[in-house]
A protein has these predicted regions:
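Non-catalytic cap/lid and distal C-terminal segments of serine-dependent acyl enzymes
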Residues: 2-5, 24-266
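Asp/Glu-rich intrinsically disordered low-complexity tracts
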Residues: 4, 8, 12, 16, ...
Length: 266
């Protein structure tokens, strides 16, 4: 479920070098930059081909979120969540909240065409897989992106001619306490999945067990929608789990994110 859409919890490809991987530093390589308004903070594993988790939210240098050794982490800080994570325009669900925009496609394009090439520019090999993980509206975006992403062949990222085997940008997604109540989401996911493979292999969905206990007529269906979405993804051949956590939307945000990451990279 999404928390107040106007409040976001704190959490905060590519060319490749010719250097031998044995010369790379033993500790993760950290870099920071801003790309098209997105704050990027990378901690890249020195292991060649290491999976990469793209974590949506506020970049936090001392984030308690941890990934195992041999997994890289890219924090992506995004402002104006109701605009930049919303896939299409929709009216506000809280009296004092903003309406939703339609900036998700622009955000996804920026991730694929600018953020990933920069973040992965010093890698010696493509990652084994990429995971996209977010909380609340960022979780909605992760799910939407997972069934929307356009595939590109691996050769394209290496500057070669494309073959006929497209590969999804993100193979795994985590939608943690996601805004599964968002209008039109169920129909959209149905439409995308009915078109064939979307490139996802794993999907993690979760909610707090009190998130649906609200008089808000839109949000009260969040658990029902989450369970339906998990079933749709599983039936499409995507390894999927739906987890209920104790509490409301704002409870133990970091712990819930950690559980998602642990499942996605196990």
């Amino acid at each position: 479920m999404s928390a107040t859409p106007d409040t976001h919890p704190a959490a905060d490809a590519a060319t490749h070098p010719t250097a031998d991987t044995a010369t790379r530093p033993a500790n993760p390589v950290a870099r920071k930059t801003i790309i098209s308004g997105l704050s990027i903070h990378t901690q890249m594993s020195s292991v060649a081909g290491a999976p990469i988790v793209y974590l949506l939210g506020d970049v936090a240098d001392n984030s308690p979120i941890q990934v195992p050794e041999g997994v890289s982490l890219v924090n992506v800080g995004v402002d104006l969540w109701e605009e930049n994570f919303s896939p299409w325009c929709a009216p506000r669900v809280f009296a004092k909240g903003p309406n939703f925009g339609d900036g998700a496609q622009k955000t996804l394009d920026t991730l694929i065409n600018q953020v990933i090439p920069w973040a992965e520019s010093e890698l010696s090999e493509l990652p084994a897989y990429r995971a996209l993980v977010g909380y609340s509206l960022a979780g909605l975006f992760s799910l939407w992106a997972g069934v929307t992403q356009a595939g590109v062949s691996p050769q394209v990222t290496r500057g070669c001619q494309p073959d006929n085997t497209p590969a999804a940008t993100f193979q795994r997604i985590g939608a943690v306490s996601g805004s599964f109540w968002f209008p039109g989401l169920l129909d959209y996911v149905d439409q995308q999945l009915s078109g064939g493979a979307v490139g996802l292999t794993h999907a993690y969905l979760s909610l707090g067990d009190r998130e649906a206990r609200t008089p808000n007529p839109q949000i009260m269906h969040v658990r029902e929608n989450a369970e339906l979405l998990a079933s749709k993804l599983q039936n499409a051949g995507i390894t999927t789990t739906f987890e209920l956590n104790r509490g409301n939307h704002f409870q133990n945000v970091e712990g819930r994110m950690q559980k998602a990451l642990d499942w996605l990279v196990k």
